[in-house]
């Protein structure tokens, strides 16, 4: 670990954080940079502040008061130890020997007794974690993702590869020139052996360098991906309500393309401009006709590349809506199979899915055929130019304008020139893709919090009033003129399709439209923000096909908070605690059990007892549903009316149905 020396007595804490960040994250913080990161108090940092600021540097710090023996038993490589008015980092080197990294004195060793004399008894463990994410926008995007040191390293790797290629060309020229008088057979054998050895070394070194480059790239990619995904933990409800899961998973593609632009395309541009200038000059000095061939080859390669790029861009624009349609229909089909039994709708959705699949397959086939055709044309053009160079070279040898050695040399560097010059044109396409991915990443970072500007504060209602409410169920059926006073514990019934579930869903405030007024006590439902309703209104359906295992529900945590032994007995009698896979009835019991610690919420239960055995329903109601009414507002949709205590606790929606 490299020491960062403090310049003032109060800087030991920040220096310790910088040393650990440099060691665990391979950062390169210097003293002055650390002071820019934190507004350092005059008294220095405390353990609490070390824990807080440590997250900024990607450090998970936990402090303890403990003995030396307990310190020895802690897991970890490095520990922060508190001396009187001073912090140091220690590392257990041997059983009775500690290596100390002191921002005031440097590195030194202490045995147990020496450490014990200076130590105050307070220490902290240090673990590597993801760094906190600062706000990212278009103005500071470049700063967050551009790493000059990595770009310099990648340019250095490219220079090594080019140097090897140039050395190979020069060596070939030298070998042919020095063996041309030994006879044709000897000349060929020497050249082939020497060429294969050099080519083998080149390929081996090229593979190693590319491996190093790929390892560094994917290490950086994984770090940034974890760094970005950590932001999801701090995002608001509004953020997730406005972002689809597909948008969140797209981050990986956008991130990879952005990092490729900085770490691949920018170094390639720097190298390509340099190589094109130097080698183009060399070719022009030696023979202009080869330079013109190279220029024509570059133009042809660029034309093929641009055709492929714009074709792919156009076909991708066609593919996006088809893919979105395919995903949308797949979700609808999944809902049909899980929540409905509607053969006509199933057949319609399958027809739509088949159409989308066929169109997507046709688009994929077009892209594949186009890529194959482009590669074929490019390969053919390369062969044509190779034969043209060879023909000009043979003519030049016959006319004694240059030697065989020069032909091999010019052949090698001309190929290098055309390859790198073509990359300059390809950089334009990379810029186009970078701009697109950058904008997408910035958009995904944005978190609009205007939803939090709600008009009223949440309070659990005692009554929900519906005044002249009308709800459209489908094109032929409405719930009209609903004037209802819904009270805690009330059960809603009615024939199938009478709008029971729709009414509960409207009370969630999640976008279903209605006419009229719905009031929670004296407050209008529309006055609450979507975030407030999401956190305070619970809607549970009996259709729980997505969950199979008790670990999906956080079962262990809920058990710790359960105080009623009869509930324990219910869980044991229904076999929930020892089941690997849960039945539908067990899932319903479990989801009701997990609600037990809720307070001041509106809980909407949509047929959450329909899969439970008939003999168990009264017991489940008494132990899991009725207690919810003590601290919450509960509404139930049920066909089984044995739980209704009086007519005042029952609402039948069937009389409100109207044909339209």
Swiss-Prot record:
Residues 464-660 form the ABC transporter domain. The chain crosses the membrane at residues 150-170, 188-208, 265-285, 290-310, 379-399, 402-422. It is found in: Cell membrane. One of its GO terms (biological process) is proteolysis. Residues 6-126 form the Peptidase C39 domain. Keywords: ATP-binding, Cell membrane, Hydrolase, Membrane, Nucleotide-binding, Protease, Thiol protease, Transmembrane, Transmembrane helix, Transport. Gene3D superfamilies: Cysteine proteinases, P-loop containing nucleotide triphosphate hydrolases. It holds the Pfam family Peptidase_C39. PROSITE patterns: ABC_TRANSPORTER_2, PEPTIDASE_C39. CDD domains: Peptidase_C39E (cd02424). GO terms for cellular component: ATP-binding cassette (ABC) transporter complex. One of its GO terms (molecular function) is ATPase-coupled transmembrane transporter activity. It comes from the Bacteria. The active site is at 12. It is a multi-pass membrane protein. ATP binds at residues 494-501. Belongs to the ABC transporter superfamily. This is Putative ABC transporter ATP-binding MG390 homolog.
């Amino acid at each position: 670990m490299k020491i960062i020396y403090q310049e003032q007595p109060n800087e030991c804490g920040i220096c310790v954080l910088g040393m650990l960040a440099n060691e665990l994250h391979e950062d390169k913080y210097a003293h002055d940079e650390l002071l820019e990161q934190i507004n350092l108090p005059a008294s220095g940092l405390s353990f609490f502040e070390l824990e807080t600021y440590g997250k900024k540097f990607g450090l998970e710090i936990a402090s303890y008061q403990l003995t030396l023996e307990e310190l020895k038993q802690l897991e970890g490589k490095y520990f922060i130890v508190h001396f009187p008015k001073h912090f140091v980092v220690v590392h257990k080197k041997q059983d009775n020997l500690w290596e100390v990294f002191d921002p005031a004195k440097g590195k030194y060793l202490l045995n147990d007794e020496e450490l014990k004399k200076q130590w105050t008894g307070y220490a902290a463990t240090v673990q590597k974690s993801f760094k906190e994410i600062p706000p990212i926008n278009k103005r500071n995007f470049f700063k967050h993702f551009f790493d000059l040191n990595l770009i310099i390293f990648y340019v250095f790797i490219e220079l090594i590869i080019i140097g090897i290629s140039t050395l190979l060309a020069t060596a070939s020229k030298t070998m042919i020139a020095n063996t041309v008088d030994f006879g044709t057979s000897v000349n060929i054998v020497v050249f082939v052996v020497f060429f294969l050895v050099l080519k083998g070394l080149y390929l081996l070194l090229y593979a190693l360098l590319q491996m190093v480059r790929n390892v560094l790239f994917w290490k950086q990619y994984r770090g940034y991906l974890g760094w970005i995904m950590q932001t999801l933990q701090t995002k608001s409800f509004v953020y997730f309500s406005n972002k689809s899961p597909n948008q969140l998973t797209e981050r990986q593609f956008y991130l990879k393309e952005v990092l490729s632009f900085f770490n691949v395309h920018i170094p390639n541009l720097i190298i390509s401009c340099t190589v094109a200038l130097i080698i183009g000059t060399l070719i022009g000095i030696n023979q202009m006709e080869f330079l013109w061939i190279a220029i024509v080859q570059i133009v042809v390669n660029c034309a093929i590349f641009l055709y492929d790029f714009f074709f792919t861009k156009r076909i991708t624009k066609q593919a996006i809506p088809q893919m979105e349609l395919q995903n949308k229909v797949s979700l609808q089909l999944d809902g049909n199979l899980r929540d409905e039994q509607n053969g006509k709708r199933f057949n319609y959705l399958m027809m739509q899915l088949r159409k989308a699949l066929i169109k997507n397959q046709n688009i994929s086939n077009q892209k594949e055929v186009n890529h194959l055709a482009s590669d074929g044309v490019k390969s053919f053009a390369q062969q044509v130019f190779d034969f043209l160079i060879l023909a000009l070279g043979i003519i030049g040898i016959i006319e004694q304008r240059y030697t065989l050695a020069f032909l091999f040399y010019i052949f090698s560097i001309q190929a290098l020139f055309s390859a790198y010059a073509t990359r300059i044109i390809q950089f334009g396409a990379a810029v186009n893709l970078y701009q697109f991915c950058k904008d997408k990443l910035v958009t995904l970072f944005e978190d609009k919090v205007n939803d939090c500007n709600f008009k009223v504060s949440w309070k659990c209602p005692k009554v929900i009033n519906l005044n002249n409410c009308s709800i459209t169920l489908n094109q032929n059926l409405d719930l009209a003129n609903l004037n209802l006073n819904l009270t805690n514990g009330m059960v809603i019934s009615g024939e199938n399709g009478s709008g029971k579930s729709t009414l509960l869903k409207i009370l969630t405030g999640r976008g279903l439209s209605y006419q009229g007024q719905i009031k929670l006590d004296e407050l209008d439902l529309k006055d609450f923000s979507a975030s407030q309703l999401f956190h305070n209104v619970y809607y549970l359906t009996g259709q729980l096909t997505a969950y199979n295992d008790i670990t999906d529900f956080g079962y262990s945590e809920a058990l710790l908070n359960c105080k009623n032994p009869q509930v324990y007995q219910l869980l044991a009698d229904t076999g929930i605690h020892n089941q690997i896979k849960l039945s539908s009835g067990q899932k319903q019991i479990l989801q009701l059990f997990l609600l037990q610690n809720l307070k001041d919420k509106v809980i909407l239960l949509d047929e959450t007892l329909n899969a439970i055995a008939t003999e168990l329903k009264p017991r489940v109601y008494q132990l899991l549903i009725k207690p919810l009414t003590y601290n919450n507002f509960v509404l139930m949709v049920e066909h089984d009316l044995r739980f209704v205590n009086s007519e005042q606790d029952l609402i039948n929606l069937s009389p409100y149905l109207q044909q339209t």
